[in-house]
Amino acid sequence: MMKAKRKVIGDQASWVIANEQVRLAVTRRGGHMAPVTFCRDTDNPVRPYYVSPWQGEGLKIDEPVLVPLRGDFFCMPFGAPSTHRGESHVCHGEPATAKWKCRGVKADGEVTRLTMTMKTKVRPGKVTKRLQLVAGHNVVYVQHVLEGYSGGVSLGHHATLAVGDREGSIRVATSPFRLGMTNPGVVGDPAERQYQSLAIGEEFTSLAEVPLLWKDPATADCTRFPARTGFTDLLGVFAKPEECPAWTTATVEDEGFLWFALKDPAV
């Protein structure tokens, strides 16, 4: 194991690994992965991930996950802050908000791997994060190993993409899903100076026709983004259990690239 390169990026202490195709940074606080540069050996490198604009402004931020907010990060439990069976969890859990320890970088032939660990306290256990780059691949291979836990928990990878201003400039698609549903509760609360447009707790079978709160139009095309500027919306799709990976894509037409994520639908 080699010592990982450490650098302050966007106000956050981060570890950095790279090969000819990809360079990535991951924050010590929360393990948020960004910036990530793909295709760095070409004339048109791609940086698909968002980095929150308040970094370096010295703001007091009460929600821990918003302090380093950027890129992609692991959530356990995924969701709003809540108390469950005596466990009081912050939004998206300790892995997305607490400090990780770097265990080093290993370069083995064409593979470069960064390993990080965290011992959680609210629900005691250990999480091992591995971020891996392979020569010739414009991909980040991500693995999280959970040890010592018992009981159910919602897991999630929170990919946060940088989005331009032009409405509908990103095309969103997914693998086949068995259930689509809008959030069962209020997401955009006017009392918090937010508004939502999607209906509450409604099922759907196509991203192109997702129920809205109003009747005209009654549905929204969620295969295009940005859309309905000014509204805060949330929906979920649940993959069909198949042997093939579940996937999500975002085609960024103005910049000429496609971002994708693959995962095991059984997890």
Where are these regions (language model features)?
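Surface-exposed acidic/polar loop and edge beta-strand patches at domain peripheries
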Residues: 1-141, 149-154, 158-267
